[in-house]
Amino acid sequence: MLPMTFMRSNRTGMFLISALFAAGNLCAQQVDFEMMTWQEVKQAMAAGKTTALIYNGGTEQRGPQNVNGGHTLMGHATVIAIARKLGTAIAAPVMPFSVNNANAALPGTIGLTGPLFASLNEQVAEQMIKNGFKNVVLMGDHGGGQKELGEVAKKLDAKYAAQGIRVVFCDEVYEKANADFDKYLAAHGYPLSSHAGIPDTSEMLYLGSDKGWVRKELVATALGDPMRKAGEARDPNANRVNNGIQGDARRSTPELGKLIFEMKVDAAVKQIRQLLPAK
């Protein structure tokens, strides 16, 4: 029979080995820049995570049923999922402001001008390059700012090309994913909606149903001003609801939210891999 002191020592050693293994595994899975130490970032880059993902959220009224930080909250979940699926990326802190403008009638928006938004993204991208990242991907969860992100990426990609550093704009996380989801909704008989409608409300229900992102008791009455088809003029005699919702969000569900979330992640990962092919 082994001495008790040996058994205790052996158990302690096994515990320490298990703890070290768990810590190392956690570090390998971590992709959230603001939740990492500088040593963990350096180790991750050395292990191949050399792409920085800069995702822009936004603070904006989202109808009576959704919290104002929806773009940023969804953006954080989206960019973390993209980074994990890529396997070669780290997610920078999500930007909480977009190209937009406040409105006293619906006091939930904090916006930036286009030039300031572009300058902010340019400086953050260059900071990530100074940190040692070899690729930077710019993305946005809000329609305002897409043009500026494309321009910044083009400018910095040219500036750093001689150093072998790439800066690219992933637009399909917004444009393609939303277009594909709209087609799905139309094909399955859902009503038209955009801002604070079925896409936004459903995704926030899926990601934050238990976190207070959506006032669930208000979804059943989440009906805004009717959507107009492309080129269709607004009826001057129609009464405006003006509650921040564009269209009808009443049929929003977490299941639909899961679908649009996965569409965004898949579209982004596919495009990023095309923009930054493995060497």
Regions inferred by a protein language model and the residue ranges of each:
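Bacterial N-terminal signal peptides that target proteins for export
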Residues: 2-16
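Short intrinsically disordered, low-complexity coil segments enriched in acidic
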Residues: 1-3, 214-215
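Extended, histidine- and acidic-residue-enriched regions that form the cofactor-binding/catalytic faces
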Residues: 29-115, 119-137, 141-279
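Bacterial N-terminal signal peptides
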Residues: 13-25
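N-terminal start and proteolytic maturation junction detector
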Residues: 8, 19, 239-242
